[in-house]
Amino acid sequence: MAELIVTDASHVDQASLEDFTLDAAWGADENDFELTVDRLIDAGSYVYFDGGECGGVVDSLKDSLKDGRSTLTYGGRTWHGMLANKILEPDKGKDYLTVSGTASTVIGSLISRVGLDGVFDAVDSPTAGAQTIKSYRFDRYTDCYTGLRRMCAANGLKLRLAYASGRVNIWAEPVAHYGDSIDNDLIDFDATRTWRKPNHLIGLGKGDLAARVVVHWYADAKGNVSQTQSLRGVDEITQVYDYSNAETAELNQKTCEKLQDLQSEGEVKVTVHEDSGIVFDVGDTVTARDNLTGITVNATISKKIVKVSDGVLSVDYGAE
């Protein structure tokens, strides 16, 4: 049975709960939770599963009174949401924030930069040891969580978090690739296979009207991106990417990256059977295949949804 630990506003453990309903999500969006429990919890308290990634800070309370009975529903940010509410700004006089070095050192400096070093401890991976971040340039004024995930992804890594002993440990470790080694009986999935995606992206940058910087990027039938067009007529799908104030070099880089992002093979919702023993992390890759239709979709886990009801914990995943 799942047990949820609740602290007070000073983050001192107060109770271990078994009777509660929880809906938490983190990854590409949401990064928050909703907790229904018959107990008063102070604003600013932590709720968490010991040693796990699921947890966060209580920010709100909804009190629903019906037939003389109150239902208390608390809302809050997951640890990931706390990071997502902080912005990584360039140093004064600099156009971009650039980092490199040992992952724990880099992550620790970024955590301190956004004022969350009182909550998070940057550590080496407990299973894979120290990792390295090659020179990485953040998008201007990106949120800290998105920036950290993208930095890790650019280095073949994923971002991990776990609450233990009053602190949230945060680290980077290599991405796991789950392919044909997974027994299809252990997972269910809803997969949408997209054969034709946007393959011509027009980037619009600095300037006005005829003086505006314009670049063109193309994807071929296999999703390879370049400035050479191969798909035309009914097969050409064109979109505009507005990246105002960008000069040509930056506009080319961002338009290329955007078109690469649009080349996802499809969308996948993955449900792992409770007794499978399989645990994905945001950033891992998975291959979903239905032998009947022959549909195979390679996707990256972009979201993790944890729910608890009647003492039973379930985990779903979003992938793209």
Where are the predicted features?
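Solvent-exposed, acidic/flexible segments
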Residues: 69, 96-104, 137-145, 196, ...
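Acidic, small/polar-enriched beta strand-loop surface segments
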Residues: 95, 176-311
